[in-house]
Every structure is written in structure tokens, then in C-alpha cells.
Amino acid sequence: GDLERVDEIRKACSKEFVLSSGDDNSCMEFMAKGGDGVISVVSNIMPSQMVQWSNKVRSGAGLADDEARAFTALNDLVVFDTNPIPVKQALHFMDVFASPEMRLPLVAMEQDASKQLIDKMLSMGMV
């Protein structure tokens, strides 16, 4: 969506209205502009980190450069394939799921994409 509209929407709604982003890529900027939070794909992989970063941004502190790079890298993890396939594969690599099996209509990640995913996760210290 148009991030410039966050302030406009915030002013038009009551204080009780929860304004959430559905886009991981722009959610930090969305919250910095007054959004309340995000319905996030990435948070399935690193929930506590997303909470920490979200709280920091909403408080006005913003993300440090290394945090912003890590956030971008996490977003990059979930685009190796159609959602939720990369998330499920990542959770398998993290030993959260015992098996990488999917039920239809989902199918297993392509081997090349799976290798890229595990390599990225290893470089980030996630597994």
C-alpha cells in the first residue's frame, strides 16, 4: 500500500482502531509512520526478534544499521518460494517441524531454493 496514507488513515479512525500492515517488506516504515503492527510472515521464523524490532520502531528509536540488514535478510528468506513453503522449510531446518513434508496443494521446496535457504539461515546463525 501507500505508506503516505498511514497518517491520513490514523487521523480518520478512532484511537481504538488497530492499523496493521500485511507487508513484511515495508512494515517497519509503516510502524514508524504510526501503524500499530504487522500481520507477518517473517514472524513465524523469528517471532521474538520481530516483536523486539517492532517495539523499537513504534517507540521511535528506529533500527540500527545491523538490525535493518538482519530484517532485510529475514525478508529475503521468505521469497525463495511461494508462502508458506519457505517458512515451513525454515521451521524444519530449525527443528521446529520434524518433517519438511507438505500437504497438497503445497509441495516441497525445489532443491536449489532449499539449499539457498539453508545457506542463508546458516550465515545468519539461525541453524
For every predicted segment, state its role.
Residues 31-36, 70-106:
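Conserved short secondary-structure transition element at the edge of the structured enzyme core
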Residues 11-17, 94-97, 126:
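Short helix-capping segments at alpha-helix termini
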Residues 97-127:
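Flexible C-terminal active-site loop/helix
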Residues 28, 89, 119:
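Surface-exposed charge patches
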Residues 1-79:
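Catalytic alpha/beta core domains of metabolic enzymes, predominantly
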Residues 54, 90-91, 121:
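Hydrophobic residues within well-ordered, non-membrane alpha-helices that form the packing/core
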